[in-house]
Regions:
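Conserved acetyl-CoA-binding loop-helix of GNAT-fold acetyltransferases
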Residues: 96, 102-115, 135-139
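Conserved GNAT acetyl-CoA-binding A-motif
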Residues: 110, 116-128
Length: 165
C-alpha cells in the first residue's frame, strides 16, 4: 500500500464521494447524530464540485476521506448567525470513512486546507452535540465565534485566523 495522498476530486470521484459521505452519515446516525442524513446525493456532490474545491484523501485508488473548501457560506449561516463576521473561506463536508477515523486523516485534510488559505480567514460550523468534533476544531486552532440554531440543530460557528496562532 502507498501512503495516502490528497488531490482535487474529479467527476469520476462522484459515486465514491456519495458513498463515503453517506457511510459517514449513517455512522453518525448510529451515534445519535442525524444532521447529515439525506444531505448528500449525486446532485449535491456534483454541485459541490462546481462551486468548491473538493479534496479527496486517496490510498491507491480508494477514497478514504474528503473535504470541501469554498468562498460562499452555507445558506443557513445568515439565519443562524446574522451578526457573525464574514470569512474569506468556508470549510464543509470534512469526512473520513469510519474504519479510518481516529488515525489522523481528518487532521491531514484540515491542515491541507489551512495551508491553502495562507493568512485568510476560514469558518466552519459544527453541531453542539458532537463534543469530540468540537474539541478537534479547538485543538486545531479554531475559535468559537458564534452559536445558534441552524437546520434544526444547535450549532457553533468556528473561525481560524492564522495570526491568532
Amino acid at each position: 500500500m502507498t501512503d495516502p495522498k490528497i488531490q482535487l476530486a474529479c467527476w469520476q470521484d462522484v459515486d465514491a464521494l456519495v458513498s463515503l459521505l453517506n457511510t459517514c452519515a449513517n455512522h453518525m446516525h448510529q451515534q445519535g447524530m442525524s444532521h447529515w442524513l439525506d444531505v448528500y446525493n449525486e446532485q449535491s456532490v456534483r454541485q459541490n464540485l462546481l462551486q468548491k474545491s473538493v479534496y479527496v484523501l486517496k490510498q491507491d485508488s480508494m477514497i478514504m476521506g474528503c473535504v470541501a473548501l469554498g468562498i460562499q457560506q452555507a445558506d443557513y449561516y445568515e439565519d443562524c448567525w446574522p451578526l457573525a463576521p464574514v470569512a474569506d473561506f468556508y470549510l464543509t463536508q470534512l469526512a473520513v470513512l469510519p474504519e479510518y477515523q481516529q488515525a489522523g486523516y481528518g487532521r491531514i485534510l484540515l491542515q491541507h486546507c489551512l495551508g491553502l488559505i495562507g493568512q485568510h480567514t476560514l469558518q466552519l460550523d459544527a453541531v453542539a452535540h458532537y463534543p469530540e468534533l468540537l474539541n478537534f476544531y479547538r485543538k486545531s486552532g479554531f475559535k468559537q465565534v458564534a452559536q445558534g440554531i441552524g437546520l434544526g440543530d444547535h450549532r457553533y460557528l468556528f473561525e481560524y485566523r492564522a495570526s491568532a496562532q
